[in-house]
Design a protein with these regions (language model features):
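Acidic/His- and Gly-rich active-site-bordering loop/insert found
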Residues: 1-106, 123-132
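An extended, acidic, His-containing surface patch that forms the Zn2+-binding/catalytic region
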Residues: 52-56, 62, 67, 174-175, ...
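Short, solvent-exposed loop/turn segments at the edges of secondary structure
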Residues: 69, 89, 131, 162, ...
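A common structural junction motif
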Residues: 78-79, 228-233, 330-338
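Acidic/histidine-rich catalytic neighborhood of metal-dependent amide-processing enzymes
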Residues: 101, 107-187
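A short core secondary-structure module
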Residues: 151, 155, 210-233
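Flexible glycine/proline-rich, aromatic-decorated loop/lid segments
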Residues: 170-171, 182-197, 399-409
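Short amphipathic alpha-helices in soluble, non-transmembrane regions
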Residues: 215, 325-333
Length: 438
C-alpha cells in the first residue's frame, strides 16, 4: 500500500468508527455533531475557507469562488443504516484488511463524503480558489425521510440560489452492469423513481382460530400480495434515459444482444418481456414496483385478527406516476376488501438532460480519471437527497466515483459493506476534477 492510500484509508476508517445511524424522528443529533467535529479536525483547510451552516444536524458549506456565475453543489450524506447480522469484521470498526476497508458507510456514503472533502481540503491547502462558488451539503437523515436535505433546499429557494449542477450519491463504476455487457461502466443517475409507503388493511370480526371460516384478514392479504406479484397493473415502458442506457451498454455486447439493445425502440416488446429476467435493476427501471416490507396481525397464536395489515414500499415510474400507480393498486386491493392508506406521499424527480454541458463535465471527469470506462445515464430505482435539489437546479446527477464489484454493491445496506483501498485515490482525483473544471 502506498503512503497516499494508507493515509486515506486511516482517515476514512476514523469516520466509519462514528456510529451515525439514522433513526426516524430522532431529536438527539449529538452523534452527528461529534462526527462533524471529526470532519473539522480532518479537513481544517477547507473548513477555514468555507461558510458553514447547521440545519439540525445536516449542514451546508459555501466555498466562495472568483466569479458570480452559477455555483455547483456536491452532496453526500452522513447517516448510515443499522448493521445487524454476523459481519466478517465489526461494522463500525473501520477494519483495514484484505486490501479493503470494512464497515457500514464505506460506500453509502461516508466514503463519498470523505473523498469530496478530502479533495476540497487538498485544493484549499494550495490556496486554490474555485472559478464559481462551490457548495457542499450533507444530510443527517437521508436513510429515513430526507428532511434535512428538504430543509436546506427550502432555504436555498428562499435565497434564490440556482445551481449549474448538483452531484450526489448514485451509480458507481462496475463491470458488466447488465448481463452480456463486457465493458466497465460509470452509471450516472439522471433521475430517480418516486417513493411512497402504502398500508393495506384487512378487517373482520375476529374470533377463535379453531373455527377460522374463509377469507380471514391474513388470507385476503396473502391473496392480494400474490395478485400483485402476478398482475400487470403497472405499465412497463422504455423511457428516453433507459433507451440511452441500453444503447451505451450494447457497445460491449456480442450479437444478437448488441443489435437488439442497440435498437431498443425497434425491439421494445421483446425487451419489456426479457429485461426483468436478465437484470432486476434494469427491470425496475421499466415500471412501478411494489415491495411488501412489514406486516402485523393478531398477538395470539389462537386468535383470529380483527385487523391485519401489510406495508408496501412503492417506487413509481416517471411514465405512470404516483397518482396513477396508487389508483391501480388501490383498485386491485378493493377486490379483496382491503383498504389502501397512503402513509407518506412522495414525488419523482425530473430527469436531467444527459446531453447537457454539466453531464458532459461529469463524463469528461470520468474518462480523465478512469481511462477506458464508458459513461452511461440511468434512472435510479432508489431514493436520495438529490430529489429535493431538483427544486434548485435543472441538472441533478447521481454518481459516486468508486469502482466496485457486484458483491460490494450487494453489501450496501447488507452484510460486510466494504471498499477496495485502491478505489480511494481515484475518487479524490475525480472530485478535484469537478471542483476545478465544473
Amino acid at each position: 500500500m502506498d503512503n497516499r492510500t494508507n493515509i486515506y484509508a486511516q482517515q476514512l476508517s476514523k469516520l466509519i468508527q462514528c456510529e451515525t445511524i439514522s433513526c426516524d424522528h430522532q431529536p438527539d443529533k449529538t452523534k452527528f455533531y461529534e462526527f462533524q467535529k471529526l470532519l473539522r479536525q480532518m479537513f481544517p483547510a477547507i473548513f477555514e475557507k468555507c461558510i458553514f451552516e447547521d440545519f439540525h444536524g445536516s449542514f451546508l458549506m459555501k466555498w466562495q469562488g472568483k466569479s458570480e456565475a452559477a455555483p455547483i453543489l456536491l452532496m453526500n450524506h452522513q447517516d448510515v443504516v443499522e448493521a445487524p447480522g454476523a459481519w466478517k469484521y465489526p461494522p463500525f470498526s473501520g477494519t483495514i484488511a484484505d486490501r479493503k476497508l470494512w464497515g457500514r458507510g464505506t460506500l453509502d456514503t461516508k466514503g463519498g463524503l470523505w473523498a469530496m472533502l478530502q479533495a476540497a481540503n487538498e485544493l484549499a491547502e494550495t490556496d486554490f480558489v474555485p472559478q464559481n462558488d462551490i457548495y457542499f451539503m450533507s444530510g443527517c437523515n437521508e436513510e429515513t425521510d430526507g428532511s434535512g436535505a428538504e430543509e436546506i433546499s427550502a432555504e436555498l429557494q428562499k435565497r434564490g440560489i440556482r445551481f449549474k449542477m448538483v452531484l450526489d450519491e448514485g451509480g458507481m463504476i462496475m463491470h458488466e452492469p447488465i448481463g452480456g455487457a463486457s465493458g466497465t461502466y460509470a452509471m450516472v443517475g439522471v433521475g430517480e423513481k418516486g417513493c411512497v409507503d402504502l398500508k393495506f388493511v384487512a378487517r373482520s370480526t375476529g374470533g377463535h382460530a379453531a373455527t377460522p371460516g374463509k377469507d380471514t384478514p391474513l388470507v385476503r392479504l396473502g391473496k392480494f400480495m400474490a395478485a400483485v406479484e402476478k398482475s400487470s397493473i403497472f405499465k412497463a415502458d422504455i423511457t428516453p434515459a433507459v433507451v440511452q442506457m441500453f444503447k451505451k451498454v450494447s457497445a460491449t455486447m456480442k450479437q444478437p444482444l448488441k443489435f437488439v439493445l442497440g435498437h431498443p425502440i425497434l425491439f421494445k416488446p421483446l425487451l419489456l418481456k426479457v429485461i426483468p429476467s436478465v437484470s432486476a435493476t434494469a427491470g425496475a427501471m421499466l415500471k412501478t414496483t411494489l415491495a411488501f416490507t412489514m406486516a402485523s396481525a393478531s398477538e395470539g397464536f389462537n386468535v383470529l385478527p380483527q385487523e391485519a395489515w401489510v406495508i408496501g414500499n412503492m417506487r413509481f415510474s416517471h411514465h405512470q406516476g404516483e397518482k396513477e400507480s396508487i389508483h391501480a393498486v388501490k383498485k386491485l386491493a378493493a377486490k379483496f376488501d382491503i383498504e389502501t392508506v397512503v402513509l407518506e406521499p412522495g414525488f419523482a424527480s425530473p430527469v436531467s438532460d444527459y446531453n447537457s454541458e454539466p453531464f458532459h463535465t461529469i463524463e469528461n471527469g470520468i474518462s480523465t480519471v478512469f481511462p477506458g470506462v464508458i459513461t452511461s445515464p440511468y434512472v435510479m430505482t432508489g431514493a436520495s437527497d438529490c430529489r429535493f435539489m431538483s427544486r434548485v437546479s435543472d441538472h441533478c446527477f447521481r454518481f459516486a466515483p468508486f469502482q466496485i464489484t457486484d458483491k460490494q454493491m450487494d453489501s450496501i445496506h447488507g452484510l460486510d459493506e466494504n471498499i477496495d483501498l485502491k478505489a480511494l485515490a481515484p475518487a479524490v482525483d475525480f472530485y478535484k476534477y469537478m471542483m476545478t473544471e465544473a
